[in-house]
Amino acid sequence: MRIPRLASPLLLIALALIGGWIAAWLLLPDEVAHLSFLVTIKLGIEVTALCLLLGSFPLYAALRQPKWPKLPHVLVAVSLGSLLIPTIARSLSLSALFSFYGPLATGLRVMRLWPQGQPLDSSHAAVVIALVTLYLPFTLLILSESMPSLGRMPDVAGTLGAGVLQTSLRVTIPRLLRPLATAGLVVFSQVLGVIITPRILGSEDVTLAVLIDDLLKRTMNTPEALRIAWAEMALAIPVAAVAAYFIEKERTARARPLQPALRFRGGRVLSVIPLVILAVVPGALLILSLGHSPILSMASLFQSGPTLEWFRRALLEPGFRRVLLPSFMVWMAAAAFSIFPALLVSVLILPYPQVRRSFRLLALVLLFVPQNALGVLLFMVLSRFPAAQASIPAWLLGGMGQAVPGFAFAFLLMDRVGDRLRRSLALASTLGASAWQRLLKVALPNLAPSVAAAFVATALITLDDIIFVRYLPRLPVNTAATELFGRARYGAAPDLAAACILMALFILLLVACGHIAREFPAIRRRLVASVGRPKVAAELGVEGAR
């Protein structure tokens, strides 16, 4: 009875991986590309295995331990918080940690665990560790949506006499195989297109994404870069499609709350591991970055905090001030080209469940495929129309490119309230509401939180993206992300820590605004309750007033 449940996901994964690998191998032009393909596969497997190992066991232990019931929520909150910090900022902090004179490399050399003359930051181990810290939140978030569906089944199996190994093989692994496979496929697909972290660390590993970047920006070999990009897409699209299919299947799976075990030792200890990786290590790296900041001294930070004078000096830095307006314009363009089409599409396809499902799968695939290969393909499309792209401002082209993942994310956010919105619109139509009333009083209030969240998501994409502005077919627009990436890569001496902190604070401010917009109905109800009911409530009763 258990064999089909195990065989179906494994067969899909095997077909996707083998088919993608064969297609990519045949599309690659030469031996250098084949070697980069092998390096990419090796790096993806290592990062995926470590993310699953460090994410699945601690999260399962946190859900099963009875002492701290809020611990799983803490893990999810820390994972979401770590995703708010741009990848460039996190990579810069990791670069400070892994640098030749950094604390980690110095300590390893003192303990004779690392060769004296060999740098740590450009090593393969540093890249793997850095990518694990970047993609571990994805694993925790995906698994946290599916692990509660186990319910009391592990306890029931133990009560019936099943051992730990037998319970794992017959109960736990079959039920969690699909979410584990989903998390692994998502992480693997993201590693395929990673550029920022290896470049900032100065890695010697030449992956397919790095090879494409070199061909486009150094040797200007556009045809070969396009061919490798097609190979990367052939490798990633089957993986992304299977991951999207598994996520869609998990949406319809029956979920039961995972109750704490009666006796489960070591859960809190295991749960500390991802907390240290996602919370303590970034905090220490932030302090380390501040210590190397030429603008902000540690003494003034602890005495008076990040004062307005510090913000003024950071904002007056010429390079940072020069990219503020282009970054804002790219963000606005990306928000406009992603939110409004997603809003229109999500409303138009509400009565068609199969069309909604197809759009969900397409949006997930667009999010999971490597963004660098997608940027190269958009680069080639724009190159076919030189007159049109010459008349469009560079910031608008960059925003249009970033709108591709932005549209996918915005549509998924709005589709989450699609069923409720469809029922509300049907009820309003039954009660005789006009089309404008249904739009203004039903559709927009239901979609407003999703629109606000999508607005914040486009800000995250803009502040963390270098691909869609770096691969423009003419002189690219310089944004905050490209400025930080260029300075970190080419060894300039700006105040990178100050700029990263400002970016992080700006993102947190946007998230706070989105959270307030989402919770506005509840806040309004609390205000009404605190002020008092109107007089009609006293005359007609609470239910009549409602």
Predicted regions: what is each one?
Residues 1-148, 175-196, 228-241, 266-297, ...:
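Membrane-water interface segments at the C-terminal ends of transmembrane alpha-helices
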Residues 33, 153, 195, 222, ...:
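Membrane-helix interface/capping residues of multi-pass secondary transporters
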Residues 65, 153-177, 421, 427-447, ...:
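Short helix-to-coil transition segments within interhelical loops
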Residues 150, 245-253, 420-423, 515-527:
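Membrane-interface capping segments at transmembrane-helix boundaries
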Residues 157-160, 428-431, 524-540:
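Short, highly charged, low-complexity non-transmembrane loops/tails of multi-pass membrane proteins
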Residues 158-159, 163-167, 253-262, 299-306:
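Juxtamembrane inter-helical linkers in multi-pass membrane proteins
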Residues 194-222, 298-304, 465-493, 528-531:
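Glycine-rich helix-loop "coupling/hinge" segments at transmembrane-helix boundaries
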Residues 243-270:
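Flexible interhelical linker loops that connect adjacent transmembrane helices
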